Amino acid sequence: MSEDRELQALLRLTAWLSPAFPIGSFAYSGGLERAVADGLVTDAASLANWIGTLIGHGSVWNDAVLLTESHRRQAEAPGLAEIAALAEALAGSRERHQETMLLGEAFLLAARAWPDEVFERLPGKTAYPIAVGAVAGAHGIGPEKVLAVFLHAYASQAVSSGIRLGVAGQKDGVAVLAGLEEQIAGTARRAAASTLDDLGSATVQADIASLRHETQTTRLFRS
């Protein structure tokens, strides 16, 4: 990739996965709010552990694998439809399904500012990692770069949620992000070489928290 293309890729990833991109990710905690209410996440250290575990072994890892496969299949409408259906099926709760589908829909709507035929190949309703992977692949951005920024965006949003929930301050939140850098980079490299055989998670408490959040009466977040 030429220097100009490298800069273009960086700018597009920064735009697409920025908190300012209009997809509404700030409204979701992915079960973190319930984990805080249940005393599973109480401070910056446990917040970092929660985020890191999901990235390495939970739903975020599965999202990274799905993103990679979508990136590979971006030129094939049937292949995208198949992986999109799998992504929906892997959503472990009603709120998790709602989150990934609404984020995916909003991402595709906003990303049309960068026209490409990939939008016609994707299903009308598409899970978030499928949308990101296909669009990035269609624009010639390498999977490892996409994954690194995608995972960092997740971590940043989760830290922001933790700050809003009162388990960490802003200074602690920045330290959490800094501490996760090595894991994010390693997971991006691992996911870039993954296949669907690598799907799987071992984060039962996080899955239960996502389910329990559905009946939580007082809340800040939609998931």
From Swiss-Prot:
It is found in: Cytoplasm. Keywords: Chaperone, Cytoplasm, Nickel insertion. GO terms for molecular function: nickel cation binding. One of its GO terms (cellular component) is cytoplasm. The keyword Cytoplasm applies. It comes from the Bacteria. Its main location: cytoplasm. Belongs to the UreF family. Required for maturation of urease via the functional incorporation of the urease nickel metallocenter. UreD, UreF and UreG form a complex that acts as a GTP-hydrolysis-dependent molecular chaperone, activating the urease apoprotein by helping to assemble the nickel containing metallocenter of UreC. The UreE protein probably delivers the nickel. PANTHER family: UREASE ACCESSORY PROTEIN F (PTHR33620:SF1). This is Urease accessory protein UreF. It comes from Rhizobium etli (strain ATCC 51251 / DSM 11541 / JCM 21823 / NBRC 15573 / CFN 42).
